[in-house]
């Protein structure tokens, strides 16, 4: 779980990941807007409302993910803030985080679990058993909503 001492490093890791991972998929304006929302304060707020996990290699944060209710529904949950540092992608970090999230009580009790996804993350989520909600839901910001029905 995330600790009070993690938030500054976590914010920087997420911002770096967005800048690098999204550069070939989204306009710079969208990337900068997304980065501007990854503040220490917002991450602390999420950590107070969700179960928020971090993956570390030694003392360095290399990934994160959170899970909570989907709009207050007890039988539906949602993954949030799922990021893996670019130089650690493809090395099992995302799978490790997903395994933690899928053992969490929010996941265990849910019949459906949703995950909003960026374009580059879709193949990972599909590999983990998630598929597009209602065929292929695309939001105005160019993101997708995937789901896993249990």
Short names for language-model regions:
Residues 69-80, 89, 108, 139-142:
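A conserved beta-turn-beta hairpin within the catalytic core of GNAT-like acetyltransferases
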Residues 114-116, 126, 131-147:
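Conserved catalytic-core motifs of GNAT/GCN5-like acyltransferases
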Residues 84, 90-103, 127:
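Conserved acetyl-CoA-binding loop-helix of GNAT-fold acetyltransferases
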Residues 38-54, 78:
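A short helix-loop-beta-strand connector motif used in the catalytic cores of GNAT acetyltransferases and
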Residues 1-12:
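A short beta-loop-alpha structural element at the N-terminal edge
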Residues 15-41:
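Conserved GNAT-fold acetyl-CoA-binding loop/helix
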Residues 98, 105-118:
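Conserved GNAT acetyl-CoA-binding A-motif
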Residues 54, 60-69, 78, 83:
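Conserved beta-strand in the GNAT
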